[in-house]
Amino acid sequence: MPTNPNSCEVCSSSSNSSCNHFGARTCKACAAFFRRTVSMKLDYQCIDQPDACRVHCDSRVICRFCRLKKCHDIGMKPLLVKSKNERKNYIRISKGLIRKRSVLGDNVKENSEEIQNDDDPQESDAEMENESTPGPSSEPSENVSAENQETVTKFLKLEASMCDRRRLLYAETPISIVLESGKEWPYENAPLKMFDYKLSQGMSKHDFVMIMDYARGMPGFDEMNYADSVFCYRLVCAVDFVINSAYYTYKRGIEHNELVLSDGTFIPMVPTPLTGYEENANLLFQSQDDLMKFRTLMPLILHQWETCVPFAQLAPSHEEFCLLKAICVWHVSYYRLSEDGRRIAIAQRNRLIRALHHVCHLDSDDVGERFGNVMMALNYIMVNIRHVVSSFVMISFFGIINVDKSMISLTSFWNKSDTSTAPSL
């Protein structure tokens, strides 16, 4: 138990507005974790690590199994997590919501029920269905809620598969450990390697294979024609490069000032790395080719850091990250697809947006603010995607780096068209 009476009884945090949630004094983060776990009926396995299992806000990683156990131990009650049926026990008066509660006994309750039954049933149902915080879509039925949960689960599995492959390929994690339990990012508790521009060859064939599996697993991808599916796949590669690096950097801890790339390498960002354009920078390199390669890669990396900083401040949950990544793919690709492809893209994007709103509803007390902040992240992510695409084209076209042939094929279509992305939201 925490020594500070105002701190969270789960993680001992005293800086996150601790107050009573679900029957115990907890911070907002632990309350959101408990609400999401109960609402989505999630099960966890203990990772059996002393620092993580002690469940403390100072720990870099917190075991979710032990965190949930501690929530139960301090008296947090799953029954207090409001289900959809319980939310319907609120009625709208003017612009606010009040609880339908009888303080005089069953007679008043029965009278109120009779009055409600006299109302138009369609208006009553509509009122209850729209009582939730305004968003892209209120949840009008249990079917919509089930669809949202199915969408979340689908993309969690897709990202988990990619995470496992990167752990095997780049972190050299034994397969027995990979199969033991899933991770939210591939390099958790794994040593990172310093980035070496001399050894960098861009994305490898292994990367293209795992991204292909991810793309094919996206609902709607197999419904597109050949040209649309090729463009969508190429865009997934760019989105994965940008947003996964931002998420891995956030999970590593932005306070370390290290940019983590998808291949498990990192670049210290303090002091700010050189770009190769400084005065007399050529004296630091053995050859002109090394200087050109450095000048090509480092501005790309510095631009990526500009995405990582606000993304870490957003502090997305794993579910928000997975859904935002897919939303970005469909939103950007929409403007370059055929008419049939656009219909698929808009349907899938809207489905993902509804699922994201559902996740924000489970995680945050202020759903509208949280949902808006997550969606606004698309702006700076898409700006970086445009920069990455331009850099990939230049690298492949001029042969500055000895990249894989798949990389040349990946960027060939951008050589013939404008590299600008979709307008921001």
From Swiss-Prot:
UniProt key word Nucleus: yes
Domain NR LBD: 147-414
DNA-binding region in chain numbering: 5-83
Residue intervals of every NR C4-type zinc finger in the record: 11-30, 46-71
Domain of life where this protein originates: Eukaryota
Main location: nucleus
Location within or outside the cell: Nucleus
Amino acid composition bias (Acidic residues), ranges on this chain: 113-130
Disulfide bonds: none
InterPro entries in UniProt: NHR-like_dom_sf, Nucl_hrmn_rcpt_lig-bd, Znf_hrmn_rcpt, Znf_NHR/GATA
Pfam families, per the entry: Hormone_recep, zf-C4
Gene3D superfamilies: Erythroid Transcription Factor GATA-1, subunit A, Retinoid X Receptor
Database matches in SUPFAM superfamilies: Glucocorticoid receptor-like (DNA-binding domain), Nuclear receptor ligand-binding domain
Subunit description: May interact with nuclear hormone receptor nhr-49.
Function: Orphan nuclear receptor. Involved in regulating fatty acid desaturase genes, acting in concert with nuclear hormone receptor nhr-49.
Family indicated by similarity: Belongs to the nuclear hormone receptor family.
Protein's UniProt name: Nuclear hormone receptor family member nhr-13
Organism encoding this protein: Caenorhabditis elegans
